[in-house]
């Protein structure tokens, strides 16, 4: 199957909606939404929440730049910084979105599962899911860095967004 820019756009929109719905569902299902902060003092949330919005803006900057602003051929030429371009950049980009967005859809539910059960393995589930999302974010940065190395217009925005 050939991965196209339009396919990635559609994937990101559908999965992005599912991520947002998982947040709405998770928060609405929680008896105590403050417990989702995991013991972080509520006084800290005034510092954390703005960074959540900055992260969301960065995601949108990257998304807009790579999927709408640059030429479609740029996507095919995306590579890892240590490799050469082989025309499979769309595959790398889709993999990156998958590794970032699918765990983003699952972390809140896994956190609630952990809070509601006494199993010894649930912390590893939550940490594993969040680690995958973090790896996806690093992958975004690596693709942006290689685009920057290749002189792609908008790569600086992608780096800033990642």
Where do the language-model regions lie?
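Alpha-helical transmembrane segments and their helix-start/interface "positive-inside/aromatic belt" motifs
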Residues: 1-16, 46, 87-94, 125, ...
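Interfacial helix-start motif at the membrane-water boundary
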Residues: 41-61
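Membrane-proximal helix-loop-helix units in multi-pass membrane proteins
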Residues: 71-136
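Membrane-interface interhelical loops and short amphipathic "cap" helices
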Residues: 2, 29-45, 111-124, 150-152
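Membrane-water interface of transmembrane alpha-helices
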Residues: 57-74, 139-143
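Terminal transmembrane helical module of multi-pass membrane proteins
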Residues: 134-162
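Alpha-helical transmembrane segments of multi-pass membrane proteins
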Residues: 15-31
